[in-house]
């Protein structure tokens, strides 16, 4: 087993070693390079398939393989790689290839040596194929960008050590891959031939085969295919031959090159010819006054011809990658990213090898090469001991030198010889060692620091002054060079300046230069400035001498002037300097190093449009824009303000025109991907990218398509597709439901305003698309402009007059008066104004510049609309304010239509002529309908009356007939009965009479008995009668039998007897039926009552309740929706509707009073399951549900029926309920209070509900009522006595808006009392521990405490909630003006003190606003550290609102400057400030201040209207500015400009934010033009925007609060008797003194040292303190809640109702209390902490959560 495992391990190790070997990796990468298929494969396949003969095929393969081998060799061999990589070397290789191709295609054989073997290697076709495949391998990187697979070898070559082995193995791998590839292609071709996919016997009409035709035209097809592939790849790369050449800016040193003698002579000849032409007699021509005759241009032209051929063909400095050009005005050109001259290298020093960063690179590389090849250059390694000895010796020498220097310096200081040389020895550069002639300190290169002088950092010259900079910049002072040449101190050979001027100095006679003449020349230069100096007056010779000047001397003189002038003048803008400045410039140029820079300085297309440079010279692409000229130099505007430049020069006409024009830029809104790219640069090489979407953000490679999120059509996940299919199926089933729901939602959600906005947005988008389409098509603007002008002419002079004629002729035919004059007047009123492409108005006659290329618009002012008739009505002088002004203009389209905006797709009404006719027809039809309706109405009413009368009459007749018939029937029946009775009586025998009488009596008796009252007696009687009847019947039967026996019966008697028997039977049957009916009736009467009850209940439950529920189900959401709609309409915000009204989920609340008042079913509320909303209703409801022994529940009836807070509870209820439950007793004073960490309320909850083990139904009862929930959510309720910050703000509680006044005051007082009572009731403490909670117990001493309602609370908290504030409310928030510090004190502490003295309040923390308690106490304790300014930070509030300052009778001083709302609560309109809009009518009034100039007046006006603004400068045009530009262009052309501008401003056509034209007087702010250094002069637009800043008090205010909290406890100390009662501070710095109150003095005397700890409960209000305590008590992990008094209970130590403890126990108590305080906040739950954070900072987000986190782990000071 061990042997097998060993073998396996060795095999795995061997396999891994083989896999990681260089040979295998090289084979792999070489095989991968076969996939980098290029154009060379096309020639190889062509030779293998088309060429005949094996020699051609072999030559193609050998050429292909040799080319690939040379490429692999070039990877390792650098010179070969450079030769094949550079473009000019490839062109050298391409020329012989073209020759081979030319000779190969010709039919002649040029290399025919008489050898007849066609397959010989001397055959030219074989050589051509070989070189063709060889050279196209080299062209592969040129035509195709380098492939990924080809780069594998280059990348891995740097990683391996044995590079030669790697290259050979990769080449072998490439050969293997190549053979596989070729065999695979052959296999494919054989399969195609065998399957007869290409048939050779297909005939065409010309009876030619396809293959033969293909073979003949194969070469042409191949050439076309090769050309297409090259074009495809060259489209991605700009070709180097035809790329745009960039303009070069010559470097400063190029001009000062050496000039040959012949060049100077040619220059002189040119000067002579020019002088002869000009016939100028002066000897010295001016050099600076006429720049075109300057000699420097000749040198520039000459230097252009001296460029090498390679730079002309291929510029190596060109931008060959998509670099972005970053402009920098401080530099001329971009610095090249080249290799530095210095390199880092190690060198041994002081026994150690150190790195030198300034080591020459060539030396380091040479040294490495020599070390590898020659053994002499190998450095012997020095041992460690030798190196250490050497370094120690050198260090000792250094130490000695330093100590000696220090000693000498101290000696010199003692001698009081102080100089710079004492403190530092410097090395100086010397000219002569014997005489010790040193260089000057400025020119000495060995000196450092301020001795060398300071170089002023200046900006480089601009692009316009480049030529002057080149011509005037001098590196060498040539006059100084002459003096140096004459001096004997410096040799000629060592002088570099002399060598540069040696050739120029040979051309003239040096004897002419006398020193006096030179000094005269210099003095003249020094007196006058160079710019105003005329050099034609200069003479080098004195006036008293007369020298005959030959032609040669004149030429020499000119050369002298040239050289000397160049030597002296340093800059045109500066005066000539002394020798010191010249020497300084020389030495700086010698020391400074030339920085390699690109020779290009690029300009944008926008700068070209702006006129900063000549046309067609831009090198960087910018956003597509066109220059739209608004005003030209012929206009009155330029002449009026003296800006018209009437220049006579004809050369710079374009520049002068641009200066005298006012133009704007019009940008196209198309997507521009070429922005800021240099022209001629290579684009991104993205060959292997695929786009499969219509709009795709990023381009991806197809290799990574699996990792990209794809659409459904490109995904292969079957599970997802099945899901989508099922969803579609469900959607098809529920299609009808979706339609109904969608229809309802659209009706409810969509408003008409949104639809209008959408329509406007769609129209605007269509307009932009049409405009861009016209702009993108070639020659479209020309066609459009011509069509517009033709349409204008046709409309004005053909179409409209013809319509007028037709209309008036028709009127004549209809016998109406024609309206020739009216129509002619309207036609004459119509005018056509030419506008730019964007619609900027010019004039009627003036066309915009380049309107054929840039585009044009034609605006029709007062367009003519043909009317069927004209109205003659007197116009009313009064106009309605709300009526909108009709637009009396339109734009003309190409089709001759009228459009409101240019390029709009919705034309105006074409049939406006028929509109009044249709209106008249509608009126007539309405009148006819009204008349017919009245007639039909009357007719229908009359007809109804007639029908009613007829029906009533018919009914009456029918009733009378029926009544008569009934009477007759009744009469006949009576008669019939009487007749039969008479017959029966006549023929009746005696016995039968008796029997019948008995029967009749029985019947009458039985009937009467039934009607009797007693039912039992009646039953007995009926039974007796029945028995009697039976007896009678029996007797009758016996008698009949006897008669039959006797035979005495007669026939008549038999007939009568039969009749009597039948009658008796009938009577019996009727009797039986009557009895049955009577029994049923009796039963029904008994059960009717219960049945009716049951029936009514069923109807009520099944029918009536359902009917009642239907309107409730439908009405309730309807009412709530109407409420929401009204709320939205009032506030204009959807969020308020969600805040104020939350619907009740229950629909039919059939519940009791308790359930109705104390159960809240709003489960969707965010306060659900929240303990913080425990209310009194919850307590009483749970008390009622709990079982209590010996308690009368009816005592709580009043509490339960009262649906709001019952603030005061009677003692009986307290004792019975609270005492039984263990909460508290009413007589708290006389009992021992349980001073526990967990209060009694928590104990009660814990005992009954086991902390959090509550059901959902119980948790649902923890919510308070709806109105209280809203109040706690939105803060303080409304009260007229409250000091409000924002008087315009409206309370979101719309329901309670009617309850303002006295009722609302009472409710707030009750609520405040209840808060205080509940807090003191639940969180009581004795006097000793009262500092923990910051209050006094309510039940200790002052029972009759009165809570004042005249407390000042702010409507908004200190830390306002910003998330739900609408932007209109937010912009009117308080913003502090930092610039002005007014002396107004917003807190009058003296007034507060007076109020305190007047009131008898034991606890000042509750009448004062609860949030300010801690700050007030802090300032009262130590007012020296914390001023009022830090506490409240009220500086000057620059707010535009109506100040309603309430006067106080007790105090005559003016109160706080905080703006209070008036009692009427007037709705103040807000001033909405929009971008680019001017001044609007404002309802606010501020007192005007006296301002000195007009500038300040207008700025004050802006400040007053817009409150906060800043000047924003943009290059684009907004709608409002564009509208102002239109109006402004028309106003400029008018004569009376001032009146028209005022009128246009009054009409609202022109805003006050119009643009400021450059170098002109401003119409709105004339003071701005006086300021020279104003930024407004640089830009051309002036925009006013409202500042979207957060409030200034947030940041500083929060910081001050947090810092003040820490300062409070640091400065707490004992108050001695010596402590001053008043602290006087300077009033100007917002400090004031505070007097101590009487209550405070008492507390200060009894105050002891307390732990230096911030109590978090002091931050909260009374209600929120209760919330905090409840949350802490309900926290399940709070195990420290031990009853504190259980340990220390001792009855003997109880004295007068309070517990006395020893000092030790007090210390223990303090420690426990400290532990409680420390673990109070950290043990708190994060959710609860966030809730408290939201309440305190009044916000919904956690942005200020970090401030609360400060109090999590505070620093505890232990006494």
Swiss-Prot record:
- List the residue ranges forming a coiled coil, or say none: none
What InterPro entries does this protein map onto?
TIC214
Main localization (coarse): plastid
Give the way it sits in the membrane.
Answer: Multi-pass membrane protein
* Source species, domain of life: Eukaryota
Q: What residues form the membrane-spanning segments? A: 23-45, 64-84, 129-149, 172-192, 221-241
Q: Name one GO biological process term.
A: protein transport
Subcellular location(s) of the protein: Plastid, Chloroplast inner membrane
Does this UniProt record's set of keywords contain ATP-binding? no
Under the heading Pfam families, the entry gives: Ycf1 (PF05758)
The record's keywords, sorted A to Z, are: Chloroplast, Membrane, Plastid, Plastid inner membrane, Protein transport, Transmembrane, Transmembrane helix, Transport
Cellular component GO terms, alphabetical: chloroplast inner membrane
Q: Which family does it belong to?
A: Belongs to the TIC214 family.
Q: Describe its partners and assembly state.
A: Part of the Tic complex.
Q: What does this protein do?
A: Involved in protein precursor import into chloroplasts. May be part of an intermediate translocation complex acting as a protein-conducting channel at the inner envelope.
Protein name per the record: Protein TIC 214
Q: Which organism is it from?
A: Phaseolus vulgaris (Kidney bean)
Q: What is the lineage of its organism?
A: Eukaryota, Viridiplantae, Streptophyta, Embryophyta, Tracheophyta
């Amino acid at each position: 087993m061990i042997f097998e495992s060993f073998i396996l391990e060795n095999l795995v190790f061997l396999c891994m070693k083989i896999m990681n070997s260089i040979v295998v990796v090289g084979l792999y990468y070489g095989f991968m390079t076969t996939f980098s298929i290029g154009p060379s494969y096309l020639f190889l396949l062509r030779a293998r398939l088309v060429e005949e003969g094996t020699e051609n095929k072999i030559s193609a393969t050998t050429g292909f393989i040799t080319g690939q081998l040379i490429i692999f060799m070039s990877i390792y061999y650098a010179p070969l790689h450079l030769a094949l990589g550079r473009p000019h070397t490839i062109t050298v290789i391409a020329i012989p290839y073209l020759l081979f191709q030319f000779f190969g295609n010709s039919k002649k054989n040029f290399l025919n040596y008489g050898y007849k073997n066609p397959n010989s290697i001397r055959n030219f076709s074989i050589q051509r194929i070989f070189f063709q495949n060889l050279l196209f391998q080299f062209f592969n990187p040129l035509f195709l960008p380098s492939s990924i697979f080809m780069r594998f070898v280059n990348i891995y070559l740097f990683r391996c050590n044995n590079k030669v082995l790697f290259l050979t193995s990769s080449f072998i791998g490439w050969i293997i891959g190549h053979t596989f590839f070729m065999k695979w292609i052959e296999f494919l071709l054989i399969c195609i031939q065998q399957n007869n996919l290409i048939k050779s016997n297909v005939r065409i009409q010309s009876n030619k085969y396809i293959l033969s035709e293909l073979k003949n035209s194969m070469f042409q097809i191949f050439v076309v295919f090769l050309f297409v592939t090259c074009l495809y790849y060259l489209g991605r790369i700009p070709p180097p031959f035809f790329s745009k050449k960039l303009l070069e800016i010559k470097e400063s040193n190029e001009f000062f090159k050496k000039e040959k003698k012949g060049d100077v002579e040619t220059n002189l000849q040119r000067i002579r010819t020019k002088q002869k032409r000009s016939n100028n007699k002066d000897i010295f021509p001016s050099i600076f006054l006429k720049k075109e005759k300057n000699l420097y241009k000749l040198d520039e032209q000459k230097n252009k011809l001296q460029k090498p051929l390679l730079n002309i063909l291929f510029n190596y400095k060109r931008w060959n990658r998509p670099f972005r050009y970053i402009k920098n005005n401080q530099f001329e050109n971009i610095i090249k990213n080249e290799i530095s001259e210095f390199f880092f290298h190690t060198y041994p020093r002081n026994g150690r090898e150190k790195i030198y960063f300034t080591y020459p690179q060539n030396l380091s590389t040479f040294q490495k090469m020599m070390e590898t090849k020659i053994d002499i250059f190998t450095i012997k390694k020095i041992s460690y001991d030798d190196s250490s000895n050497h370094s120690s010796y050198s260090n000792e020498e250094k130490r000695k030198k330093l100590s000696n220097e220090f000693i000498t310096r101290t000696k010199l200081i003692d001698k009081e010889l102080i100089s710079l040389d004492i403190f530092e020895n410097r090395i100086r550069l010397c000219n002569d060692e014997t005489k010790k002639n040193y260089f000057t300190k400025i020119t000495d290169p060995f000196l450092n620091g301020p001795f060398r002088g300071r170089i002023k950092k200046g900006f480089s010259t601009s692009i316009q002054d480049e030529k002057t900079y080149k011509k005037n910049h001098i590196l060498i002072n040539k006059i100084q060079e002459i003096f140096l040449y004459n001096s004997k101190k410096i040799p000629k050979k060592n002088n570099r300046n002399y060598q540069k001027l040696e050739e120029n100095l040979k051309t003239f006679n040096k004897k002419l230069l006398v020193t006096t003449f030179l000094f005269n020349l210099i003095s003249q230069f020094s007196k006058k400035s160079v710019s105003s100096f005329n050099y034609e007056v200069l003479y080098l010779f004195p006036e008293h001498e007369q020298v005959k000047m030959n032609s040669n001397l004149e030429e020499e003189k000119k050369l002298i002037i040239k050289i000397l002038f160049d030597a002296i003048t340093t800059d045109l803008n500066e005066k000539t300097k002394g020798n010191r400045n010249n020497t300084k410039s020389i030495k700086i140029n010698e020391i400074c190093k030339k920085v390699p820079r690109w020779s290009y300085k690029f300009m944008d297309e926008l700068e070209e449009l702006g006129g900063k440079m000549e046309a067609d010279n831009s090198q960087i692409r910018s956003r597509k824009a066109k220059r739209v000229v608004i005003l030209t130099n012929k206009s009155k505007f330029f002449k009026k303000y003296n800006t018209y430049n009437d220049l006579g020069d004809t050369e710079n006409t374009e520049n002068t025109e641009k200066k005298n024009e006012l133009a704007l830029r019009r940008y196209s809104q198309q997507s521009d991907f070429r922005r800021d790219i240099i022209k001629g640069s290579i684009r991104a090489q993205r060959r292997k990218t695929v786009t499969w979407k219509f709009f795709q953000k990023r381009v991806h490679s197809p290799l990574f398509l699996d990792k990209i999120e794809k659409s459904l059509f490109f995904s292969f996940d079957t599970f997802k597709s099945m899901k989508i299919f099922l969803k579609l199926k469900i959607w098809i089933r529920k299609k009808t439901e979706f339609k109904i729901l969608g229809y309802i939602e659209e009706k409810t959600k969509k408003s008409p305003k949104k639809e209008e906005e959408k329509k406007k947005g769609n129209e605007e988008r269509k307009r932009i698309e049409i405009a861009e389409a016209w702009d993108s098509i070639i020659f479209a603007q020309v066609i459009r402009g011509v069509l517009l002008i033709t349409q204008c002419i046709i409309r004005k002079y053909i179409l409209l007059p013809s319509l007028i004629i037709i209309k008036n002729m028709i009127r004549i035919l209809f016998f109406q008066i024609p309206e020739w004059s009216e129509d002619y007047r309207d036609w004459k009123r119509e005018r056509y104004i030419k506008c730019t492409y964007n619609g900027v108005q010019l004039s009627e006659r003036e066309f915009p510049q380049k309107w054929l290329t840039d585009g044009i618009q034609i605006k029709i002012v007062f367009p003519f609309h043909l009317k069927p008739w004209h109205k003659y009505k007197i116009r009313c002088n009064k106009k309605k304010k709300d009526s909108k002004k009709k637009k009396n203009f339109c734009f003309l389209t190409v089709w001759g239509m009228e459009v409101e905006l240019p390029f709009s797709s919705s034309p105006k009404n074409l049939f406006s002529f028929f509109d009044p006719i249709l209106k008249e027809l509608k009126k007539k039809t309405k009148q006819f309908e009204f008349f017919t309706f009245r007639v039909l109405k009357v007719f229908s009413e009359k007809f109804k009356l007639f029908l009613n009368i007829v029906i009533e009459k018919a009914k009456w007749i029918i009733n009378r007939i029926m009544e008569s018939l009934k009477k007759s029937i009744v009469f006949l029946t009576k008669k019939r009965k009487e007749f039969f009775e008479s017959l029966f009586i006549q023929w009746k025998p005696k016995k039968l009479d008796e029997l019948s009488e008995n029967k009749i009596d029985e019947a009458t008796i039985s009937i009467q008995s039934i009607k009797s009252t007693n039912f039992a007696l009646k039953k007995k009687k009926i039974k007796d009668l029945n028995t009697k009847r039976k007896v009678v019947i029996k007797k009758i039967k016996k008698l009949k039998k006897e008669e039959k026996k006797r035979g005495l019966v007669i026939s008549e008697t038999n007939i009568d007897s039969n009749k009597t028997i039948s009658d008796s039977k009938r009577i019996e049957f009727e009797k039986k039926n009557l009895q049955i009916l009577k029994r049923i009736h009796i039963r029904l009467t008994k059960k009717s009552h219960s049945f009716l009850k049951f029936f009514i209940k069923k109807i009520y439950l099944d029918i009536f309740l359902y009917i009642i529920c239907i309107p409730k189900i439908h009405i309730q959401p309807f009412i709530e929706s109407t409420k929401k709609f009204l709320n939205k309409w009032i506030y204009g915000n959807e969020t308020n509707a969600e805040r104020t009204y939350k619907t009740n989920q229950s629909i039919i609340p059939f519940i009791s009073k308790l359930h109705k008042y104390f159960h809240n079913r709003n489960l969707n509320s965010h306060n659900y399951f929240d303990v913080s909303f425990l209310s009194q209703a919850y307590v009483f409801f749970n008390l009622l549900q709990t079982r209590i022994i010996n308690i009368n529940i009816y005592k709580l009836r009043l509490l339960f029926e009262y649906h709001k807070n019952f603030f005061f509870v009677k003692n009986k209820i307290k004792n019975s309920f609270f005492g039984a439950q263990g909460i508290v007793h009413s007589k708290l004073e006389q009992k021992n209070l349980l001073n526990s960490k967990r209060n009694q309320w928590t104990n009660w909850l814990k005992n009954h509900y086991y902390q959090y083990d509550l059901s959902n139904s119980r948790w649902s009862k923890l919510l308070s009522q709806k109105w209280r929930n809203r109040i706690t959510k939105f803060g303080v309720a409304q009260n007229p006595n409250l000091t409000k910050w924002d008087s315009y703000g409206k309370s979101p509680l719309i329901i309670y808006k009617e309850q303002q006044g006295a009722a609302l005051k009472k409710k707030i007082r009750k609520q405040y009392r209840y808060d205080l009572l509940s807090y003191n009731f639940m969180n009581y403490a004795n006097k000793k521990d009262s500092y923990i909670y910051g209050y006094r117990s309510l039940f200790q001493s002052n029972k009759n405490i009165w809570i004042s309602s005249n407390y000042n609370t702010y409507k908004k908290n200190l830390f306002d909630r910003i998330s739900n504030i609408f932007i209109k409310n937010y912009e009117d928030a308080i913003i502090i003006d930092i610039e002005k510090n007014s002396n107004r004190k917003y807190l009058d502490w003296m007034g507060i003190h007076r109020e305190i003295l007047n009131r008898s309040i034991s606890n000042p923390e509750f009448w004062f606003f609860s949030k300010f308690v801690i700050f007030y106490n802090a300032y009262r304790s130590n007012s020296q550290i914390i001023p009022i300014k830090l506490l409240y930070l009220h500086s000057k509030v620059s707010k535009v609102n109506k100040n309603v300052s309430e006067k106080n009778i007790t105090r005559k001083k003016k109160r706080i400057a905080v703006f209070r709302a008036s009692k009427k609560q007037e709705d103040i309109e807000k001033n909405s400030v929009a971008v680019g809009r001017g001044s609007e009518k404002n309802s606010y009034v501020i007192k005007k201040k006296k301002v000195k100039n007009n500038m300040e007046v207008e700025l004050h006006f802006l400040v007053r209207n817009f409150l906060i603004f800043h000047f924003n400068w943009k290059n684009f045009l907004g709608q409002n500015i564009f509208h102002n530009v239109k109006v402004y262009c028309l106003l400029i052309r008018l004569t009376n400009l001032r009146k028209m501008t005022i009128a246009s401003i009054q009409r609202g056509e022109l805003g006050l934010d119009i643009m400021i034209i450059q170098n002109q007087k401003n119409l709105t702010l004339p003071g701005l033009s006086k300021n020279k250094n104003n930024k407004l002069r640089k830009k051309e637009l002036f925009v006013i925007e409202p500042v979207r800043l957060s409030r200034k008090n947030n940041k500083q205010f929060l910081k001050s609060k947090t810092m003040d909290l820490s300062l409070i406890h640091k400065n707490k100390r004992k108050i001695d008797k010596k402590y001053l009662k008043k602290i006087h501070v300077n009033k100007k710095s917002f400090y004031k003194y505070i007097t101590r109150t009487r209550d405070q003095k008492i507390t200060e005397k009894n105050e002891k040292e307390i732990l230096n700890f911030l109590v978090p409960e002091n931050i909260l209000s009374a209600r929120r303190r209760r919330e905090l305590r409840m949350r802490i008590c309900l926290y399940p992990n709070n195990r420290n809640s031990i009853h504190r008094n259980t340990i220390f209970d001792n009855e003997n130590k109880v004295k007068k109702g309070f517990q006395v403890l020893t000092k030790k126990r007090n210390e223990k108590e303090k420690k426990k209390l400290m532990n409680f305080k420390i673990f109070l906040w950290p043990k708190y739950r994060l959710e609860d902490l966030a809730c408290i954070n939201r309440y305190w900072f009044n916000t919904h987000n956690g942005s200020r959560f970090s401030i609360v986190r400060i109090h999590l782990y505070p620093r505890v000071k232990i006494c």
